[in-house]
Amino acid sequence: MLVLTETSVGFVVFKLSSDAKIDNKDLWKEFETPEGANKALKVQAIQRFTSTASAVEDLTAVQDGRLTDSLSRFLLDTVGGADDGEKKKKKKKIEEMLVVSDPKLAGTINKALSIPVLSDSSTQDLYRGIRQQLASLLGGVDQKDLNTMSLGLGHSLSRFKLKFSTDKVDTMVIQAIALLDDLDKEINIYAMRVKEWYGWHFPEMAKIIVDNIAFARVVKAMGFRTNAVTTDFSLLLPEDLEATLKSAAELSMGTEISDSDMTHIHSLCDQVISISEYRTQLSEYLRNRMQAIAPNLTALVGELVGARLISHAGSLMNLAKHPASTVQILGAEKALFRALKTKHDTPKYGLIYHASLIGQAPQKLKGKMARMVATKAALSIRVDALSDADSRSDVSAAEVGISNRVKLESRLRALEHQAGIQSVRKVVSANGQQGRQQPRFEMSGVTGSYNAATDNVPLNGDLLPTQPATEEVKEEKDEKKDKKDKKKKRKSEVAEAGDVTMDGDADLSMVAGETKEERRARKEAKKAAKAAKKAAEESGDGDKKSKKRRADEDEDSEKKKKKKKKDE
């Protein structure tokens, strides 16, 4: 049985002795000593690498499972077999099995050279022993020299892989933008902690200095608020803020803190300052990386938005495979699927919303602008991804992105003109400043004046200027009282008229002059008439009910007769 091994020296074929069984569980004991290893394996043939470049080429092909021409000729000369499926006639065919470490390479050798191969988990102990005793098996090779050759070849192979890796720069951009987001969160958390901590000592300072980094620098320079008067803030703050800060420090309502408290606050300020400085360096690094990997995309949407798009897609090549519609909503997948589920309108933009071209567009045109920016961004991404590395480093590499940006800006101005929207960028004031200026507020109309004479209290018996108003109030009260009296009188008249008409059936002329006995007799007669009327109504209802009952009985009898006839 023959064993193929890849080493830093070259390809080596060993002859496995008949005493050493490859399926033996104790095979590793044969390689505990150099003597045992030489007894189990003998060098059958060796093909040395002529140069580092050829070694890198052959080993890269072997790792990919490909069979190079040099390795194919070496195996044909050493093991035998058939070249390109044709049987070899001149050379003697060797009927021995070849052990290969890589299963993919083993399948390629068997298919191309018709050599029986073995590559499974049972060969792991064998190759582990070969690597352990390789110097003694090769014979005459120093272990230090072998290690040096392996190290040099490993470095060359790694450089070769990195050189042709399509994701090598994408990884740097993805990690940089993720770290930038983390640093922003850390700076925000630490800065808020500094403000809350130092606010017990100087609470007014948080309203005067809004910037977090400037706040930390001022706290670091000033220390206790009593030192504000003697501290020079000219390098940190403008003159007006410096004067406001010093005056507020003298009248502060904060509590006193100890030296140990101030020491810890200073340490936290150092953390905020150092992290902010590193964030500036990282931002510059990211900008340079984006200029190198995607100059057109950077010129169109900026380095931060471009880096976030690449990070979300996974790599520049994956981003180049997306259509413009996907680039437009990239980052808004959650809102997209929620809209599809609820059958609502889908989102118009995702991460691309933070591009400056969309930010400067009016709210009415943001959706249309996002669609146009995504279209041009898709073209720029494909140019960056599929162009050569040398062309990306050229000065004119961002020509496509710059030209697309100019077109989009002119298109935005045209859309604003069509919609009748005045752009903020076009407005120029009289003094040459950009943007709309708020008009100065001016008082208009006639303003009233205060009557100071009403403040004087008269010492004599004269009436006050407001006294005549009491007569008008009295007249209003009298009018209200008269209205109430008239209303009560009308209600009483209506009530009396109702009492008279209650007995409308009786003779009113007799009611006025009748006695008690006559009134009693009249009431009894009236009751008797009502009772007779009620009895007559009840008798009429009884006749109706009896007639209805008789009709129902007749219908029931007819139904019974019909049923009997059917039964018969």
From Swiss-Prot:
Q: What InterPro entries does the record tag this protein with? A: Nop56/Nop58, NOP58/56_N, Nop_C, Nop_dom, Nop_dom_sf, NOSIC
Q: Which GO terms describe its biological process?
A: rRNA processing
Keywords associated with the record? Nucleus, Ribonucleoprotein, Ribosome biogenesis, rRNA processing
Could you tell me where the Basic and acidic residues compositional bias lies?
471-482, 534-544
Q: Which GO terms describe its cellular component?
A: box C/D methylation guide snoRNP complex; nucleolus; small-subunit processome
- Please give the Gene Ontology molecular function terms for this protein: snoRNA binding
The role this protein plays is:
Required for pre-18S rRNA processing. May bind microtubules.
Protein name per its UniProtKB record: Nucleolar protein 58
Organism field: Cryptococcus neoformans var. neoformans serotype D (strain JEC21 / ATCC MYA-565)
Encoding gene, per UniProt annotation = NOP58
